[in-house]
């Protein structure tokens, strides 16, 4: 069951859901909380390899990922960051979100942005129970024109769903959790998987 606005506000007040900085109640709709774009980005750079071989050794895969991923790009609030047609860019929410072990979060991009060709969260929209940190966004510009985004703008919304019980292995207690406590646009750590 998804939490309604009243239950979201109650969970924020009681501290079972933590969003920092705490959102104003005006950005809590009937079923979700608006999230804003943060200041950290990473882009994919050109690479001489014809493809990314996910079956290669962990060391080789890690080396290739590091070579195609830019260093962190920090953009000041209100300044534009351009995403060009066909470009995949990582960003992060301005807010840090912490969930208890009995709630799962779901992140959706804004419909108004999708109608311009911008996919805000390409596939990984589930926020696991026990999650704590910024939420990395996988932007893809499927439109025909570059799109200028500005840190601080509303980029999406998160809603919360109660589970049938508390998770035995929430994200914050898993030894193999690759993105614990992230605060910036962290690139793929697929080479760290078993």
UniProtKB/Swiss-Prot annotation:
UniProt binding sites for dCTP: 110-115, 128, 136-138, 171, 178, 182
GO MF annotation: an example: dCTP deaminase activity
Positions of the UniProt region annotated as Disordered: 169-194
Known catalytic reactions: dCTP + H2O + H(+) = dUTP + NH4(+)
Active-site residues from the entry: 138 (proton donor/acceptor)
The entry's keywords: Hydrolase, Nucleotide metabolism, Nucleotide-binding
SUPFAM superfamilies noted in UniProt: dUTPase-like
InterPro entries in UniProt: dCTP_deaminase (IPR011962), dUTPase-like_sf (IPR036157), dUTPase_trimeric (IPR033704)
Composition bias, Basic and acidic residues: 170-181
Polar residues compositional bias, start-end: 182-194
EC number: 3.5.4.13
Pathway: Pyrimidine metabolism; dUMP biosynthesis; dUMP from dCTP (dUTP route): step 1/2
A biological process term (GO) from this entry: dUMP biosynthetic process
Family: Belongs to the dCTP deaminase family.
NCBIfam families: dCTP_deam
Record's subunit section: Homotrimer.
PANTHER family, per database record: DCTP DEAMINASE
Known function: Catalyzes the deamination of dCTP to dUTP.
HAMAP family given in the database record: dCTP_deaminase
Name of the protein in question: dCTP deaminase
Native species: Marinomonas sp. (strain MWYL1)
Taxonomic lineage from the root: Bacteria, Pseudomonadati, Pseudomonadota, Gammaproteobacteria, Oceanospirillales
Gene name in the database record: dcd
């Amino acid at each position: 069951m998804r939490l309604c606005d009243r239950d979201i506000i109650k969970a924020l007040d009681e501290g079972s859901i933590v969003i920092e900085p705490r959102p104003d109640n005006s950005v809590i709709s009937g079923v979700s909380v608006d999230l804003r774009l943060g200041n950290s980005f990473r882009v994919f750079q050109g690479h001489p390899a014809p493809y990314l071989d996910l079956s290669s050794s962990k060391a080789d895969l890690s080396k290739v990922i590091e070579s195609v991923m830019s260093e962190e790009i920090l953009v000041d609030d209100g300044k534009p960051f351009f995403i060009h047609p066909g470009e995949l860019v990582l960003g992060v929410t301005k807010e840090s979100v912490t969930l208890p072990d009995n709630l799962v979060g779901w992140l959706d991009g804004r419909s108004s942005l999708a109608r311009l060709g911008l996919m805000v969260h390409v596939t990984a929209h589930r926020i696991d129970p026990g999650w704590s940190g910024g939420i990395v966004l996988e932007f893809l510009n499927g439109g025909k024109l570059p799109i200028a985004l500005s840190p601080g703008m509303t980029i999406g919304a998160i809603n919360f769903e109660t589970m049938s019980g508390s998770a035995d292995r929430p994200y914050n207690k898993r030894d193999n959790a690759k993105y614990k406590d992230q605060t910036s646009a962290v690139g793929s750590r697929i080479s760290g998987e078993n």
